[in-house]
UniProtKB/Swiss-Prot annotation:
Record's keyword annotation contains Glycoprotein: no
Signal peptide residue numbers: none
The protein's name: Transcription elongation factor spt-6
Cysteines joined through disulfide linkages: none
One Pfam family named in its UniProt record: HHH_9
Domain SH2: start-end pairs: 1209-1306
Matches recorded under PROSITE patterns: S1
Feature: compositional bias, Basic and acidic residues: 123-135, 177-199
Record organism: Neurospora crassa (strain ATCC 24698 / 74-OR23-1A / CBS 708.71 / DSM 1257 / FGSC 987)
Keywords, sorted A to Z: Chromosome, Nucleus, SH2 domain, Transcription
One GO CC term, this protein: pericentric heterochromatin
Stretch list, region Disordered: 1-199
Amino acid sequence: MSNSMRDLIDGEAELDDEEDDESFDEEAGDRPRRRPNIDDSSEEEEDDEDEEEARKIREGFIVDEDEEDEAEDSDARERRRRKKRRREREEEEQLDEEDLDLIGEAIPEWERKPQPQRLKRGHRDDHRPTERRGLAEIFSDEDEEHDDRGYGRPSGRAQADEFDDFIEDDYPEDDEERRHREEDEEVARPKDRGLNIDTTGLDKDALEDMDAIFGNGEDYEWALQLEEEQEHAERTKEDIELQDVFEPSQLKEKLLTDEDNRIRFNDEPERFQLDRKAFKNLQMTSDQFKEEARWISNLMLPSKNLSSELHGPFNKAVGKVLEFFVIDGVEVPYVFQHRRDYLIHAKKMRNPNRRDDPDAPEYTVDAEKLLTQDDLWKVLDLDIRFRSFLEKRNALEQTYDKLKEKTRDDILEEMIRQAQSIEELQDLQDYLNFQYSAELKDLAANDNSAQREIKRAGGRTAQFERIRRSNAYKFVQALGITPDRLAKNILRESSKVTSEDDSRLPDDLADTLVDADFPTGELVINAARQMLAEEMFASPRMRKHFRKNFYGMGIVSCRRTDKGLRKIDEANPYYEVKYLKNMSIADLAVRPELFLKMMKAEEEGLIEIKVSLENDREFRQQLFSDFASENFSELADKWNAERQKVIDLAFDKLVKVIVKGVKDSLRTACQDELLKTCRELYFKRLDQAPYKPKGMVIGTTPRVLTLSNGMGDPNREPVSWVSMDEDGRILEHGTFTNLARDESQREALAELVRRRQPDVIGISGFSADTHRLIKDVEGLVSEKGLVGPEYDDPETNEYRSDLLEVIVINDEVARLYKDSPRAVADHPSLNPMTRYCIALARYMQNPMKEYAALGKDVTSLQIHPYQQYLPQAKLLKHLETAMVDMVNLVGVDINVAMQDANTAHLLPYVAGLGPRKAQLLIKGINKNGGVVTSRDELVGDPERHKLPVLGPRVWNNCASFLFIEYEPTNPESDPLDNTRIHPEDYDLARKVAADALGLDEEDVKAETDENGAGAIVRKLFKDDEQDKVNELILEEYAEQLEREYQQRKRATLETIRAELQVPYEELRKKFESLTVDQVFTMLTGENRDSLCEGMIVAANVRVVKDDFAIVKLDCGIEGRIESHDVSYRHSIKDVLHVGQVVQAKLIDLNRKEFVSKLSMRDEEMRRPFRRHFDHGRDQWDYRKEDEDREELREKDKSTGRAQRVVNHPLFKPFNSTQAEEYLGSQPSGEVVIRPSSKGNDHLAVTWKVADGVFQHVDVLELQKENEFAVGRVLRVGKYTYQDLDELIVDHVKAMAKKVDELMQCDKFQKGSRNETEKWLTTYMDANPNRSTYAFCIDTKHPGYFFLCFKASRNSRVNAWPVRVIPHAFELMKSQYPDVRALCNGFKLRYQSEMLKQQSGGR
């Protein structure tokens, strides 16, 4: 890599003295620390404070004396080292602004924003920060004796100085107060401390005269001390590199480690480097490369459904694709776009239509697609798997080669080369370790590299080595054929060899074989059985036979555990697999999510998965018949009985290891299938062009107006809106109220539309009430006659305009964006709902960009209902491949990406690039002036003084996918740089253009000599004659290229034809409108599985009339209950009243209109809802299901347990785990009331504190009318409430508000306690003269936070627990009403603790 390229990233850094606190706010790391043992419970929490814990925490103030001494000695040394000359730093040693962006900002690495410079005042502002020492030393009496700080202030001020650092950034006074305070401090600096008269030998009058003339020598010491401080700062700057300032985890997160730099500068595609990182030392021979092509072809062919005549071309295509990947180093998009001819099998045939039509072409080409773009990713994945397979095989061969000098094994010789999977290689490795454990131990003495593997093998097989060396092994040989020979018999790999019976009975033979190791015949027989069973177990051919049968005849069944009996109820997602049985491997292959659900339930201990053979009995019998002798006698029967015992021993061991392998392989296969489905679904979301207004060309960016009511009622709560132009600029934003009835607001919206003329109105929200907003806006558009832009109607050839379209927007990206650090950085002054509307507008203008901006957060999207059963790393990788395909299909305007951060988010997905190389690209272009005029200059242009930005191989990958808009007025602008044509094919494109224009070689030469190489294509565009390329017969030209130059360019020529007519044409599908079901799910959170007809649901009564009632379901939709569906005996008003929560059966659900019909009739309620599962009659254990229902019923009777129901809309019949699962997707502060495990005089309230943190509040009920009624008095610790609503509002919601207040504080860190402590340490390393503190959430004790603080660079990090209580915070038994009071209280408490410590130590 050239030096000029390496200059693009600076390795070392000089830190600015005035670095803002905010530059470290997002940094976090890990350091294991001891947590305070705050009392808590996973079910219901106690409210008592742990006094012992408080004592332990206070003990944390004791500072190590060595630490104090070191700090003091260090200060003394620094004070002695004065007047050191300042050294200039080299440019490459500086931590430049862009590097700091990479570390400190939570926005994309390539986004560059000008940083505001901190203004420095005159000497008044430049006071010297207090030197840091140990906590105990701050208040030491020795300060008065040894104070040489150069200040005139008394030493008692040291305590206040230390404390000032804590207050530094918190709630400062206004500017005027601060200015006066600083001036007062400045004036106080040269204050005379006075001299001791007794030590001078002068009288008082003489001293006064001397002071008046000369001063006391300290008047200007503050200025000298300031100079000393600056020199000290310069010394700390020297030789600082990134790893000196930031934690390794932070550097890794920001891609700034040494390994990241190697990837960044190495001229190989970034994704290739990451995928092959584990195999970078693997060298493949040409034979192995050919073997890999065959291996991949054999794995892919079964799923391709190609005719037999295409098998050969398919194998060649796979080999060629591997060559492109491995040898040429080009990525999938490049191969698919520029080597497409190798993915197609073209066959030239005579045209049968020529007989009737002489003008018809003589030949036609029949093309068959061999490999799709998805197949290319599969080949790439299998390439990595083959490398893993090859590496393991090489290691096995190396071990065997060392053994071959002493022994030869036909099984290994034959089967190593036959192995086709990792499983088979592992079988051979196990066989080698078992069969040759003694030999491997001998090798270990001479080969330390094999020590680990050999030790493992020797330890496991020591007892069998003892048998192998003893006489007992002769009994093993007498039992008959070897396990390998038996496996050959079963597999019919050669002529059958039968076992021969010894002439003696087994017992008699055993008696003759006794020795010191096995002194009795019985011990000899037992040892022989164990030995032969182990040989069968270790036999690779036997395992192959078992594995083949389990894959072909295996059946999978589930058996619930005792834990799963009650936990997996009918509402649990695992109920679908609780009683499954007799599922074949083929059945699970078509429903991969089912097996993944089984595996997850098994991991949680809820079920056991049993894999067995459908033909188990026949399989065992076949195994025995091929092992038994064919003789008929008592002797033969005795020997066959021994053989049967051996088979029984070996069978169970073999089944265990094979079943484990089958389950692992099946899980991998099911994951691959589900990942493929996720990729396809995500690709569909990406494959959307911007919304296209009528009359516009697809791909045109629309002007958009977006509105949202969020969670609120649109008739009562504000409706946020944003108007965005076609360039993505926010023109206006604001709020409306009550667009349904307030005419002034309706007119304001109409005026906004007329003023800004949007092409479309988009609406979305978080609740079913959004449906009302949609209806209101649609009615307003119709009533006011609001129309979209004019367009040319092709039917009438006249201009017309239609009513403005109102559409519902998919808001999955906007929900993630509105509160994200990126959104706050983009729009710090806007509220979350406005940012939400901005994201909605951007989504309509380009969905792909919004998805790309998510980065790794893309896995937070609900792509597939079962994606939670997939490994997140695998899911992310597959989703990224879909993004890579789409980004390279659409292309990236590199100059737009340099100016627009949203476009720059696409760069990591361009072929050849990645996050690291995208950073390199942006930085390199900036160094070259910030603008790219041609694709070629990215690899350097010395004549124009352009440094190389990318290496040749990476450039070759990405060149055609980075386009540059053609400027006809710029003679250096090449129109081909604005097309999908690769620079390697520019000459071909120019030849096509010349032929289309009818220019001969002389005309071409004259044109190019005068106007450059791009002159011909420029002329084609200038003359507007692109359509002439359609007249060319490109097939003949393609044949000529293949015949004369061995270049297959048919598809490339077609691409050239298309690009010369419409450069970078929009190839995405049109913007996709949401379906009725998708809108319903988005606004209610319910799908057809979670809410459907027949379910019994909770309903809150809103209106009661004489003949019907209106209710509202938990999901927000309205329901209607007719009077005859309530009761035949009573009036509806006697049964229902407003505010009542009732149970009702859902009779009809209109998802389009968000309305439902319900019934409360007894006969309807008595019929429970049964979820239908798609399985065969013989695949569900109905008998076991009925038995379990009866068992649970009996248990409930015996324990007196009954399902409690509370008449409240927030009540759910959940346990703690179900409550947490339910609240997991809800916003923080949401609440569930549920039964308590403590009995019917308790209730439990679970509320969401933060993501993944839930508090369970125990509510004691007093003054109950009966066992199941809610108590008139509800007690939570020392708090008492009159009803549930009061408890929710004044207790839970009050605490949630305090939690939100603390988490919005700028001193709050989002990471764990370990990460926060790491952040404090990092901050202090970068700012050694400051003190700081931060809050973080205590995830182990919901409702608590940690207040972590570090008083000086050398002091330890301390942590105090902060408890959230209703309307306040509690710290050390003291309560504080808000965060500001809490912070000030902490500082006073800290000062008090330090004074206590000092007084106690005197």
